[in-house]
Amino acid sequence: MSNEAKKHARTTVAVLYGGQSTEHSVSCISAGAVIDHLDPEIYEVVPVGITEAGAWVPGTTDTSRLRADGRDMPRVEDGGVHVQLTFGGAGTAGSAGSGAAGEMRYVTGPQAGEVFAQVDVVFPVLHGVNGEDGTVQGVLDLAGVRYVGNGVLASAAGMDKDFTKRLAREAGIPVGEELILFQPRELTAEEKERLGLPVFVKPARGGSSIGISKVDSWEEFDAAIDLAFSNDNKVIVEAMIHGAEVECGVLQHADGSIVSSVPAMLNGTEDGAEGFYGFDAKYVDSTVSATIPAPLPAETIKEIRQLAIRTFNALGCDGIARVDFFATENGPVLNEINTMPGFTPISMYPKMFAAEGVSFGDLVSALIARALA
């Protein structure tokens, strides 16, 4: 096969990153790692950045621009040239689920109207709202363009910690005590007694530890609530669960089979440690580390792996998820699910599968194969 024929035989993958989310920079870092591990002999990468204002712009394959440098986090800049993904070859939506190819075209700038790529599959490496919450997935579903990862329902439910716990409870998966607030208010004496101290106050729909506070006394509660509501209009107050934080990856193959990874234990959370990793620890100082596989009894590891798949199925997930638990004296308790887990250099999802012998490149290839199945 000639080099030109090989080029046309490659699968064209549009990698979306950035987005209108507090996790914008994390998405950029994840996308850089994904692009680095897409085999150029097999895939033609079309990077598309989404600015914090929501503009779609030509992205970069220079992944050095998609890395953190201390506190200097990568961002998608608007250079004035905008692009859009159109469908059906004429800018019209295809039938849902048709798996039609999309056209990536310029909509502003000197090449406005020009198609510069035929897209076989979209890899939405988007974290947080307006990307991981079912919004982008809905657009792609309506257009009939294939994409990596979860659909609208699983993405929306997984983004919302409240609905994740509701579905998990219905499926018989252990979860902790929580309280949902839609506006700041004082807790009642009964609520305080039920939750106890400390509590964690979180935006219900967010990630990367943004907007989260640990409250050790009720005098700290008002400030924690204000911070959480500055990031979301729905807040979850969770009781402290004593146990190590353990993460488990789930991967669905092209044939529909579902596997879970060996779990990872976040160091510093074992033996009832009561801290938590904030954004800086995860992405600026890089102080997060983990032991893989988690140093837990074989029976506990087996239970975590099974519960991860049960959670995946309870939410109707497809392709990918990372499921987080607390390993308590009485067994694993669900913390949350990530329907588009991070792919950054410190992210646990690729590391856990690497411990199973699945390389980063094989992992992203498996996810694309599932999307195209």
From Swiss-Prot:
SUPFAM superfamilies the UniProt entry points to: Glutathione synthetase ATP-binding domain-like, PreATP-grasp domain
Enzyme Commission code(s) on record: 6.3.2.4
One GO cellular component term: cytosol
Reactions catalysed: 2 D-alanine + ATP = D-alanyl-D-alanine + ADP + phosphate + H(+)
ATP-binding is among the record's keywords: yes
Binding site for ATP: 192-247
Entry keyword set: ATP-binding, Cell shape, Cell wall biogenesis/degradation, Cytoplasm, Ligase, Magnesium, Manganese, Metal-binding, Nucleotide-binding, Peptidoglycan synthesis
Top-level taxon of origin: Bacteria
Pathway involvement of the protein, from the record: Cell wall biogenesis; peptidoglycan biosynthesis
A single GO molecular function term of this UniProt record: D-alanine-D-alanine ligase activity
Entry keyword Calcium: no
Gene Ontology biological-process entries: cell wall organization; peptidoglycan biosynthetic process; regulation of cell shape
Enzyme class: ligase
Cofactor annotation: Mg(2+); Mn(2+)
Record: residues binding Mg(2+) 2: 336, 338
UniProt domain ATP-grasp: residue ranges: 165-369
Free-text comment on the cofactor: Binds 2 magnesium or manganese ions per subunit.
Gene3D superfamilies: 3.40.50.20, ATP-grasp fold, A domain, ATP-grasp fold, B domain
PANTHER family: D-ALANINE--D-ALANINE LIGASE, D-ALANINE--D-ALANINE LIGASE A
Family, as annotated: Belongs to the D-alanine--D-alanine ligase family.
Function recorded in the entry: Cell wall formation.
UniProt-listed HAMAP family: Dala_Dala_lig
Protein name in the entry: D-alanine--D-alanine ligase
